[in-house]
Amino acid sequence: MVEWTDDERAIINSIFSTLDYEEIGRKSLCRCLIVYPWTQRYFGGFGNLYNAETILCNPLIAAHGTKILHGLDRALKNMDDIKNTYAELSQLHSDKLHVDPDNFRLLADCLTVVIAAKMGTAFTVETQVAWQKFLAVVVSALGRQYH
């Protein structure tokens, strides 16, 4: 079980309180698909992902990015039990969608870049430490059902 300090909880809650889920979700998922093009294979039903411009303008990608951020909101609300909170989602990505679990880390890295850019100087070292810890727990929970 992960131990969270009061400061870590406050930092993570503060980050989420300022997020525009639509903007940050879209930018993060688009960045992941553009920077790591092999991740596009999981989005075959999302239409044309031929180049960066089509990815950035794709409403299905934007909607899924928002959905991902709302999924992270579930982790925020269940910080003391992220593993069980994501058990079903982990199984879905493992058994049905066959997503390589390394892609969760890639998306988490892209999300961090987007949030850091948005927060600017407010994304301090202390903020990053708490944020990275949170995302590491989420990524671990999402990869838990893989064998």
UniProtKB/Swiss-Prot annotation:
Coiled coil: none annotated. One of its GO terms (molecular function) is organic acid binding. Pfam families: Globin (PF00042). Keywords: Heme, Iron, Metal-binding, Oxygen transport, Transport. GO terms for biological process: hydrogen peroxide catabolic process. Involved in oxygen transport from gills to the various peripheral tissues. Heterotetramer of two alpha chains and two beta chains. This is Hemoglobin subunit beta. It comes from Merlangius merlangus (Whiting).
